[in-house]
Amino acid sequence: MSSFSFLNQSPDIEQLEAEEHTRETQIELCFQLFQDALERLKDDKFGDANDLFEKLMSQEVIKPDKWGLYAYSSSIVDNLRYLAYRNRGFFYYKFLMNQYSESMSSEDVVDNILKIVENLLESLRHSEADYNVIEVLVQIFESFKSKRLQKLLLENEFMNNDSHLLFSGRKRTNILPQLKVLISQYINLLKDLHASSVLEKKIICNGQAKNTSHLPRTNVKFKNILEQLNKLRTEDDELIKSLDIHDIELDNYDWTSLLRSLRETLPTVKSLALFGRNSDPYAETETPIEAVKVIVKEEVVIDKIHDNSNNENEVTEEKEITDNKVVTTNGNNRKRSITEIETKHAQRSSKRFRDRDSSAADSETPMTFEPMFYSYTKILSLLGCKAPYDYEAIYPDLMEVKANDIIYADFLACLKEWSHWHTDCLSSQNEKEIKTKKVESSTDVSLSHFKTLLNSKNFQKSDDHIPEISQTSLRRFLDKVNRQQCHFHELRFKLIWFLFDNQNGDRLLTSTRWTKQMYRDVEWITLSIEKNIFSFIQSDIAKYRHVALSIFETLINSLVELCEEINSKLSLGQKANDQKTQKVKIEKKITKWNSIIAQVETTDRDWTVRYLWAYYTLIQCTSDIQNCLLSNILEKVHQILMKDNSSTVYLYPNADFISSFDLSFVDTQLKKLKMIKKLVNVDKHSESDKSEDNNSQFIMLENVLLSTISENHAVGGDDDDMIDFFMSAPFMLKFKLWELIYMKYVKKNDIEKTTLIYGIMLKLLVDTLECKTYRTLGPKKRQERLLIMMSCLKDITHNCIEVLKNNAWLQKKLSWYDDTTSQLVFIFFILFPMLPVNTPNKLSGTQTFFQKATKSSKTIKSIFVDILTLLLFHLNIGLKSKISSEPELENSIIDLVSTTHISISFYNFCDYASGNFLQIAENLICQFTNEEAFTQLKQIMWCKYHYQLSGDSSIVSQHKTKAMEMSKMVSLPLGIYLVKLQYQDKHPYINSAKIASKQILDNIVETFGDLSSQDNYIIMRNLHAFNGYLRSNITSKLFQSCFEGKDKVDLKNPNDEFQKAMDAGVFYVSGIQALNLYKIRKRSVQARPSELDAIITMFKNDILYNTKRFESWYLLGKCYSYIVEDDLLWTADKISSSEKKAVIATTQKRAILCYAMSLTLFFENETTRTVDEQIVIVECLESLANELMIAVYKPMEALCFDTNLSSLVVSSSNPATSSEIEKSSVAPIYSITDSSIEDTMIKCLTLANRYQESLLEAGKLDRLNWFNFYSIAIVYSTEKLDRKGDMIDNMSKACELANKYTSVKDSVVEPHVALIHMLYKLYIEGKVTMEDTLSTLKRDKFFEGFDDDFWILDVSLTQDYQKREFFSKLIELLKYVISKDKKKWQHEPYFYIAEILFMEMKDVEKSREWMDNIISIRSVNKNLVNIWKPDYERPGKHFVFTHNYVMFYLELLKYDKDAQSIGLLTKKLRRFSSGMAYIGKANDVATSYFIECVTKKYLLHDKVYTESYMGNINYNDFVKYSQEIVDNSKAADIAEDILEVLKIAYQLKKGTNSVVYDTVCLSLFFQYIYEPYRKEHPETEPQLVSDSENKSNIRKKVSKKDAFDKIRALVDKLP
């Protein structure tokens, strides 16, 4: 189609014309619908009229798009739209007039009026309106009291085209009456609006305003409707003017509920966001809250959330359940209903915690912890300790312990009454989670530690006596609020003033106790309106100083809390950018408030002291500890308090981060600052660096601390004040100072100092709990102190264990504090009752502590696990001296670990505290090598690493733990233990069937990695010697030395951290297990050679550590042998390539050298070798002989003995040296003679047989290996050794053993076939007679099924017939062997039968029939020889057999002159290169045989048709005749065998791209196809041309290409 288009014609013209036509059609339809609608409206058929109007409005011409715009506009369409909307508006007008009655609802009236307005206003968009439209709209706007809409509508009407003359001098008499009415309305409207207009002035100037007081005519019914609208509008205005009261309902008088309600009324905003500029969330409310009324549903007194009594409804830290329900009833429904709050579920905890606790709760098995209890009491009694109570004294139902010390009952009371308060106590000292990562390596400690330490609230006074904020105050406040109907903003102001201002000399903020939630909500509200309050009170700050001080204190408390959060994040390595930004903002607010508060001059001592203390707290948080302002402020406070000798305690019961204080506390703070200055100024003028300066500070501090507990650490007089201060200091300050020193040694990993100071700190904790003061405290205070002690205990215990683990649980360097064991026992018996008392009780239906407080219970469990870890470590030390005299105590330690593990795993926390219990348990269990210990170790292995040992599923319980990574420090002793336990005095290789520990050993070895790559001089030296040995040449001297135990590789012991594990045999045993698994997979044809790489590394590492195991060398050689076997087994490609074959030879050389070194190490101490070692050396001897046999015979042909082997190994990246390979392969230089190799093979096999015979006599073996005798006979059968008798004797022995030790179902036939073939060859060579051969075979019991007559030759026959009979008997015997081959893998008997038939009996046909069983030349697949390697055939030999079979088959075909079969076989050889050895030689022979057979069979004349004939035929005639032959090949009467041979020959030429087949192809074509056809058509006989004619013509000679083109065309047509 042409792409031409007219210039004056748009490509979319047809579409535009179609759209125009559619539009015109729609316009006609719309006018028709409009007329029909008017007729229905005229007849008052409102339903039909409405349907027609709806249909009209749905037309595309009328309907606007979704944006209210119209895509097309014209005068006709605009007029149509105007009429449609105008008359639709009057349709609703008439419908309303018709349907209106007094009973009509206001909603219906308003709905119809709005439809009228909507349609009429829309009509104004499309045309100028008529008077009726303006009149109706003006009346409706007037009823809606919208004067501005009236004014806009009238002015729009005056400005249209019909009215413009009104303002250009038109006389009053010429104005229409309707327009006069509009003018009158407009003038009156302006008067009502008290406005003026340009239009008004023009109207007045022209005199049109006179006598225009005409009233519009209004329908009476419509007038009533308008009056009703006016009334509705008036009601709405009045409703809008009334206040919108927001009701808040409370169940009872409760401050927390009220504040939570006020906070939830506003949008949710985080506290940090309130520090910004636009801080008040009220600005984001959708509607204003004009008034608030608080309604209390009923006055009932209920228990408060933090009551001191035991309350079963206390909230755990994982749940948010509010006791006092708050409901709002405003239209927005911001609050949830009471039902929703009551049915609120617990906050989702992590999956790990949820799974763990539910597992114990849902357990149906009753659990008793009595075995664990008495296991500990038993061992403690042996060590002279006594339990403080009996197990029967623990009452789970009563949650108490009957004991002399009240502390045990206090701990159980904590578990029963657990609440948020208990959680805060437990985490008050350490907010950070315990991290298992290594501590920092730096030993420098910044003095910021002192600031953090001395800024803590260590001296806060008790505020228990402060009353909680009362309900009476709330009643008083709510009465005032409800009476005044306060705006929400006003309500917040009044609330702040009520709580923060001074009332009767007290501020409720400091004189009453609030709940934490109440304080948080007050703080949130304060931050919300802080700007407004500041603006309000800054002008009269003296009057409102109490409110200002309260806000100042609140902001400071928020700032200190924010600083704590920043420090916590930074210490955990987290980012705190947002917090730092908010810190800057809140500091600006505090500075602003401080600027006006500092201006207050007052005599109010209480206000002044509190302001100074708040400012002191601010300076502590925001400046350096050495800031002089700190001491200055404290001095001012101290002076004021001393002046009045005041004993007043200034409390801050609600601010968590502002300490309460009194005169004594101020004195203490001054002493703190003095002490800090002294610590900072230690060695102030020293010239040493900062690190040494810090060290001197810590040494000084350590000596001072030690002097407080021991007179042996006396210090100078300059430090007496500091000592006095420490002696009188409270517990927490002492503990923090000790912890400072303690962490220094933890970071240094100093086990001696760490354990010493840990003992001191532990004693400090225990003494605090055992002192008399503790017993005099109230229940809550005792619980608080107990939990704080637990919190302190948590980190120091965990760190102590980390140091012990890093030092491999070392004991000889420990300086244990005297009472450490008894103190650990004390803590243990405090914590132990939590196990039985938390057992789930489904009958009671109550939650246990573990179930309701998962986070806190995890902390308690972790503490318990750490205490158990250290206690077990101590008890083991105490029992070690007793175990030597009482071995039965071994089971006591095992029983202790077992019962402890069972007990704590019931609640699934045996891996808590970084798995410390599992690690100490593993360490203790590995001391004992018995079945009980191994059983427990299996359980530990599962819990720690999730290793499921084989066959142990019924013994090991799969506790819900998190698998840990194995470290080198742990894996070393574990690997030694497993090897020692599993094998003990047994030989790992001989007794390696049990591989239960294989997974663990594999992971241990993986953890070690490749030790040969270490940066260790001895390892590198040994590796060099090892690699040098594997590169050495194989010589006769090498074999001679190995049998004498001489010339071993010179290796040294590295004696590093792995030496002990290597001597124990960790790598050796793991390698044996991996090799055994490889053998299993190899038998099922699933193994890969790459799997041997890791096994080789294991044995190599064992050798490099000079373990002197001859087995490692043997197994390493075995690995190399498996690689060689795999390379020779699957494909012949690797033996067809020189480079690849050299790689195989290199691996084979390594295997032989490894075997030789194994023999060297064995024979070095042959007399001391055990029976198991003799069994191993037998295998080594057999493997060496077998590998030598593979190496020396085809296809490897002694390549590994070539001294130039290293130059033959060429990497794929350097193929340029391949010519060197060919050059060197021509004349190889061998390092050993063939006779030496054969002598070595015989010696190895003879020694192996000798060892086997001795082992058989000793009952250690049950049979001899027939394959050894078979191999010896094979070696003797070579041409270089003429030992006929030894050969027959050994093969006969092999047959005898094979018959004796094999079953009928799995009979071995190899030695019997070999015996027949050997005797046959010996007979052919004339070395044995027929009678001797049959006599020897008769002695083989394998053939006992033949009768005696079979073995006798018929002497009456001539010699030739006797030979024929003899060969027939050999064939019968071979057929019998084939019948016994169950796997049908034996191929040699077929070949031997065919060989005898052809060579001796000249029966080619039958010989080919037998060879056809193993050779297939006519099958469609590429497989030529169908054989596979039998079990006892050496690797690679089947490729040699394949070559031999093909060569023999070619001889048969050549003898039979079967050219076609030879050709087919030659074709298959090209695709069979990976299936046989020496493929090049076979191809050459097949090609020559094919050409020879074709030439002889078809009497082809060499070069007759390729040179002389082709040069003398006419080219045109050749083209003509050859084309006719191709087109009529069937009519050409060509012999079928000629075509077939030609096809094969051409395909061979095409496949090889060689000229070898040119003569055959051209001769067959011209001699048997072209020339006969030409002669049968004499009328077209071509004329021979002369030389002159040949020169005159351009193209007369036929080329080879021309001939082959026709041959190809002919061949392609053949089937």
Swiss-Prot record:
Instruction: List keywords of the entry alphabetically.
Output: Chromosome partition, Nucleus, Transcription, Transcription regulation
GO MF, one example: transcription corepressor activity
Please give an example of a GO cellular component term from this record.
HIR complex
- Subcellular localization: Nucleus
Tell me the segments the record calls region Disordered.
339-364
**GO annotation (BP), single:** nucleosome assembly
What does this protein's UniProt record list under function? Has a role in a nucleosome assembly pathway that is required for the integrity of heterochromatin and proper chromosome segregation.
For this chain, the family text in UniProt reads: Belongs to the HIR3 family.
Q: What is this protein called?
A: Histone transcription regulator 3 homolog
Q: Which organism is it from?
A: Candida glabrata (strain ATCC 2001 / BCRC 20586 / JCM 3761 / NBRC 0622 / NRRL Y-65 / CBS 138)
